[in-house]
Amino acid sequence: MSEARRIAVVPAYNESPTVIGVLDQLIGEVDEIIVIDDGSTDDTRSKIRTWIDGQSAPARLIAFERNRGMSAAYDAAFTGLKQQLAAGEYRADDLVVTVDADGQHDVSVLKMLHDEIEIRGFDAVMARRDLSDYPRFKQIGNTVMSQWASWWAGSKFHDVESGYRMMRLGALADAMTYYKGYRYSETVEVAVVLSRLGYKVSNDLVVPVPVMRSNTRLRDAVQDLCMCPVAWYRAVRRRPVRR
């Protein structure tokens, strides 16, 4: 059997200074790149289009006309991948990598995430960010969120808000039946749903954070807290979301 393909999914919103650098780093590390421009008001979209036009490797852009939030950006990409999986264009063991466009995810550690899946047998790996340089309130908030999500997931998470992940496409496609995603809740919902569906999820691999970004609003944090039990209910009760 051929090696699993790696597909990078990169949401971007007003990331003009950093997005091309991130995409350049991904070339050679993944087999395909999907970029979602989440209604940027700067020149992020035009830069992405120019970059894609100059690539020989598979890369494509999904563009929103208005800002819809990170969860909607991921949903657009994941839905397309799920449909292509059903059509036989991808395999269930192919790997989806989520990478932020702001440069806070160190692409050089992708191999470590890959080894967690291929060698240790996980279905999904969420990188555990080293937040030691972040403000104390951010560290406390992350700990509270992770402990709360762990309770609903039935699995231990140290950094459930991490957007730096690698997941088997088959597991991700299965999880999509049971989560909705609102604004920024996609990461915590997917963690809860994957765990409750019986997939093996790792959140132990500690990775550096080259760029510190901390702009989470209280409203978004409260929404994420609320979505954990909602995700649990959908997964445990097997009540699919109307999509």
Task: Set out the residue ranges of the language-model regions.
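Short aromatic/hydrophobic "clamp" motif used to bind/position activated sugar donors
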Residues: 96
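Short, well-formed alpha-helical segments that are part of the catalytic scaffolds
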Residues: 13-29
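Hydrophobic helical membrane-anchoring modules
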Residues: 1-3, 9-10, 178-243
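Acidic helix N-cap motif at the loop->helix transition within catalytic regions
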Residues: 17-21, 42-51
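Acceptor/aglycone-binding surface of glycosyltransferases and processive sugar-polymer synthases
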Residues: 65-83, 93, 104-184, 211-219, ...
